[in-house]
Amino acid sequence: MTTSHRPQLEARNGAKNIEYIPTSTQHARLLPGHKEVKYRNTKKRVLNRKVESTPSEEAKKRIKITGAEECSKDEEIQATDSSDEYEEEEEESEDEEALLEEWNKVKQERLDKKLREQRAEITAAQNEEVTKPQKHGGWRSNTVFGRKGTVNQSASISEHNSNGKGKYVNNITQSEYHKEFIRKHVK
């Protein structure tokens, strides 16, 4: 049987002790985790909007007292406000159009720059391929101990030794093979 992964505050295995007295000690894992229900914020917002949208008692009294005169004044004020809002909306839409045009220009410039860089990389790679004749003899031909075998290789070894290039070096980081490998493959 497995445990319930809860600490045993009073171990109950073994013989039952008559003098066993349970204590009032409680572990945090034995307590309930949640005691309140959480509500979504959207419901609170909807409730707040409903409360705000209902006309207050003061507004109702004011309408009854002042009558139609103030209502007509309010309508005139709202009409002027709506014309101001229309002008502001036009200005905002013009500003948005200008910003969109600038954004499109910036995007186009970035695209052109990327294309130029890619073309430059491609042409550079093609130039390297043309200028450097690819002579791939394998990695064994460059190693010190991989040159054993044929007479032609022994002749090439003596040529390397006379140049001072193919000498055996005890330190691998100082060997010509290592230097050539780093030059070719690590940039």
Curated annotation (Swiss-Prot):
Principal localization?
nucleus
Q: Which domain of life is it from?
A: Eukaryota
* Gene Ontology biological process terms from the UniProt entry: mRNA cis splicing, via spliceosome; mRNA splicing, via spliceosome
- Fetch the InterPro entries from UniProt: Cwf_Cwc_15 (IPR006973)
Q: Which UniProt key words apply to this protein? A: Coiled coil, mRNA processing, mRNA splicing, Nucleus, Spliceosome
Q: Where is the composition biased (Basic and acidic residues)?
A: 49-60
Subcellular localization, as worded in the UniProt entry: Nucleus
User: Do the record's keywords include Coiled coil?
Assistant: yes
What residue spans carry the region label Disordered? 33-100, 124-146
Any one GO CC term of this protein is: catalytic step 2 spliceosome
In its UniProt record, a GO molecular function of this protein is: RNA binding
Any coiled-coil ranges, and where? 72-131
User: Where along the chain is composition biased (Acidic residues)?
Assistant: 82-100
Q: What protein family is recorded?
A: Belongs to the CWC15 family.
* Known function: Involved in pre-mRNA splicing.
Per UniProt, subunit arrangement is: Associated with the spliceosome.
What's the protein here called?
Pre-mRNA-splicing factor CWC15
